[in-house]
């Protein structure tokens, strides 16, 4: 599982707790990276690795394929409209894998050719791609 814009690492940690064998979390902020590492130590999690860096630089070099990619970018991220293409064109999503992008109401991915559905929970939207 790949957790992009990992923040506090909650999604990756939850995936580990639900049986994910390996999680890679990418976060640019040093404070959040340290928080994730600290939480993993406290919880005894050994199969979550944290990469501190820019998500787009990570993606440009990534060669690993994932069955689940979750991205929670800042809603005002300039590259947000192109994020599905940036990820999917890298060919890092396994066949039958899922890409999930969290976003606000002002972003609409429904016209993307690999968009499957969008779910809304209050002001938060999750768009699913295959």
Feature-to-residue mapping (PLM):
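Class I S-adenosyl-L-methionine-dependent methyltransferase catalytic core
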Residues: 1-130
